[in-house]
Regions:
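Structural signal for membrane-spanning alpha-helices in multi-pass inner-membrane proteins
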Residues: 89, 179, 213, 239-243, ...
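Transmembrane-helix signature of multi-pass solute transporters
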Residues: 81-88, 171-178, 234-238, 333-340, ...
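Helix-loop-helix hairpins in multi-pass membrane proteins, especially solute transporters
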Residues: 52, 56-197
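Membrane-helix boundary and inter-helical linker elements of multi-pass secondary transporters
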Residues: 36-37, 42, 67-68, 90-93, ...
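Hydrophobic transmembrane-helix bundles of small-molecule transporters
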Residues: 135, 153-267
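Hydrophobic/small/kink-forming positions within alpha-helical transmembrane segments
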Residues: 53-57, 87, 142-147, 202, ...
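Hydrophobic transmembrane architecture of multi-pass small-molecule transporters
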Residues: 395-494, 502
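12-transmembrane solute porter fold
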Residues: 5-22, 26-34, 41-48, 85, ...
Length: 502
């Protein structure tokens, strides 16, 4: 790899890595921020759902802008926007300013990630250099998640929460300098062209995500769910009509016409669907009574393993056996590893779930970066910006499906198990249902288990039944995750066959 290539890779890692910082640290600043601004949890949940949805509006526009106006130029604009959004949050006196700041920052971060991955694919096309570049780039996200939660927890514990968005703004300044100093200037630029179709495509994805959210919260036939579905279909129809009628639309459905691209994008959707890290963080708090900061600390081995895994496992494997075989092997091993969740029980020592989530994170992140590399070469006639945008949209859909499908399945089966166990220990069906509903409504703090130490008629404590139901939920996630990992193996192999037969 030449000095210029190394400089470009460093710049991409710094700028894209900086864009992850808000997402990696925001949960740790949320509680003190709500207290300071005198906001309710419901207000915050409603308002803070807007920025990630709105960020999807620019996902396809960003891919096109990078290819037309130059990756460096657009990343420069977005770094400035990232700083502005962070500063607005730091001086916010109410919810509106927080939402506006996070909205600007979220749009900027989304655009930077889409454009940065597209630039990475364009600059590193030779297989060995590409494997090394993507292996290095794959270290960035887990490294940010390794450092930022602990750093944010320390800042919030020692000073005002407003220092955290000031930290984001400082990181944004580093991103700005890295863009100017390290990324190559565009050799040519083209007019932006029409922007209606990429914005409508992003709006369609955003509406679809909102529909899935509403289905999860309100139910499939709730009026707001049906309204979201109608909006999704209407936006999709308008976008399709414009794509067909405009002489040169900026948005294209070309990636979806390529079999290998479709298969790999399906894998991108499935990866976040497994959602084991989120469920394990809940288990650390409710099974082991850890605080949020303690949970961040016990997750350090998992993030450190992911950092090393992409560089020391994924990159060498991609060089030696190719992207497809690497992804297949990693997902196959992940499928087996997911079944080790049965070693995680209410009585298992803390190191058991730490080891489990560490192995999971290592394999998942290594497989993810391998699939990302494959997606960006899955449709040779489509530019990397569009493919990167499709990947970002697929990832967003997967994250929402994780809440609607995986969390729904885990929590539903966990509640059924808990209700059954409560009845088995002496409660009537009505009493068990009422107790389960009360527990669900109050389960908002790490010490919730101690609130239910009252023995049941059988003599077993309610907290023990709760612990067993949480462990059952983890086991459900492990089995479903193993099946989803096998589905990824199948889709990767199908995509390979479609590529060879094309």
């Amino acid at each position: 790899m030449s000095a210029a290539s190394r400089r470009t890779l460093l710049g991409i890692c710094l700028v894209v890595g900086g864009s992850f910082t808000v997402l990696a640290s925001f949960n740790y600043v949320l509680t003190p921020m709500l207290t300071d601004l005198d906001l309710s949890q419901s207000q915050a949940s409603l308002a803070l759902s807007i920025p990630p949805i709105a960020s999807l509006l620019v996902v396809f526009l960003a891919g096109g802008l990078g290819d037309r106006r130059g990756h460096r130029t657009v990343m420069l604009w977005m770094s400035v926007a990232f700083i502005v959004g962070s500063l607005i949050v730091s001086i916010a006196q109410g919810l509106l300013a927080v939402v506006i700041g996070l909205l600007i920052e979220g749009i900027a971060a989304t655009a930077i990630q889409i454009i940065g991955i597209g630039l990475l694919s364009d600059r590193f096309s030779e297989p060995r250099a590409r494997a090394a570049a993507f292996g290095t780039f794959g270290m960035v996200s887990p490294f940010v998640w390794l450092c930022l939660p602990v750093l944010t927890g320390w800042i919030v514990g020692e000073a005002s929460w407003r220092w955290v968005p000031l930290m984001w703004a400082t990181i944004g300044a580093v991103m700005l300098v890295a863009t100017l100093a390290l990324l190559p200037r565009p050799t040519s630029t083209r007019p932006v062209g029409e922007v209606a179709t990429p914005i409508l495509a992003g709006a369609t994805v955003a509406a679809a995500v909102q529909w899935l959210n509403r289905v999860g919260d309100e139910g499939l036939l709730a009026p707001i769910s049906l309204a979201s579905l109608v909006a999704t279909l209407a936006l999709g129809a308008i976008c399709t009509v414009l794509v067909r009628r405009l002489p040169s639309p900026a948005f294209s459905l070309a990636p979806l016409r390529v079999g290998r691209a479709r298969s790999l994008l399906a894998v991108v959707v499935i990866i976040p669907l497994i959602n084991t890290v989120f469920l394990m963080t809940m288990a650390f708090q409710y099974l082991y009574g850890l605080t949020v900061l303690q949970t961040a600390l016990v997750m350090v081995p998992a993030q450190a393993a992911a950092v090393l895994g992409t560089r020391l496992i994924a990159a060498p494997m991609m060089r030696r056996i190719g992207v497809t075989q690497t992804a297949s092997v990693l997902f196959a091993v992940l499928s087996v590893a997911m079944l080790s969740v049965f070693f995680v029980t209410p009585t298992s020592p803390l190191w058991v779930p730490i080891l489990y989530v560490t192995i999971y994170n290592l394999l998942t992140v290594a497989a993810s970066i391998t699939v990302t590399s494959a997606v960006l070469t899955s449709a040779p006639d489509v530019n990397s910006g569009q493919l990167s945008a499709y990947r970002g949209s697929a990832q967003s859909l997967g994250a929402v499906l994780a809440v609607v499908v995986m969390n729904g399945a885990v929590f539903t089966l966990g509640r059924l198990f808990m209700s059954s166990e409560l009845q088995a220990n002496g409660l009537t069906q009505e009493e068990a249902a009422a107790e389960a509903a009360q527990i669900q409504a109050s389960a908002t703090s790490p010490d919730v288990m101690s609130q239910y130490a009252v023995p049941l008629p059988s003599g077993v404590e309610t907290s023990q039944v709760m612990a067993d139901s949480i462990a059952t939920g983890l086991h459900v996630n492990g089995v479903l995750g193993a099946l989803l990992a096998l589905a990824c193996v199948f889709l990767v192999r199908v995509g390979r066959r479609q590529s060879l037969s094309a």
